Amino acid sequence: HTITKHFAPILPFTCDEIWQDMPHRDTDDGRNVLLNQMPESFEAYALPAETMARWDTVMKLRQDVNGVLEKARADKRIGKALEAHVTLQTTSQELQKACEGVNLAEVCIVSTCDWSAPEEGAEVAQGVNFPELTVGVSEAKGTKCPRCWMHSLDANAEGLCPRCAEVMAKFPDLA
């Protein structure tokens, strides 16, 4: 409901189609999404300060990784970011704690990312945002998934990574 109202100024036709097919509150004008009041406050949607701080840390780490990815790309060690295996090493327990439970490979848009020493021959650099961080970038190992382009050591017979294989198993008609 609220998202439809928020996106209406930039996606008016799409939001109006959604609006026409959804149930409405008594205070809504059901004729068109643009005939309704926008929510006055976004405070109800704000994340807690500690969550914002955590994601700020994760995004700064991503900036550090992207800098090393660009250098590795310029040095022709990798082509696309999805062809990269990233290693992270730090003495900061706070930085590791902020990244706990976060899929850093997904956040950094690389095939694999883990907390370990850089591989031999990897592009290695210190973090700009986190000088105590060492980022290593090397070529990802494994088979390139034809569906998501991630490289995986656990590809199935069709070459699909485990994640894509799981998704495709739910839709056997598409296989």
Tell where the protein language model's regions lie, with residue ranges.
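Acidic, turn-prone loop/beta-hairpin segments
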Residues: 1-68, 72-92, 96, 114-117, ...
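A glycine-rich helix N-cap at a beta->alpha junction
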Residues: 102-118
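Flanking scaffold residues of small Cys/His-coordinated metal-binding clusters
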Residues: 140-143, 155-156
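Short cysteine-rich clusters marking metal-coordination/redox-active sites
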Residues: 145-148, 161-164
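Short functional micro-motifs and their immediate structural scaffolds
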Residues: 150-156, 169
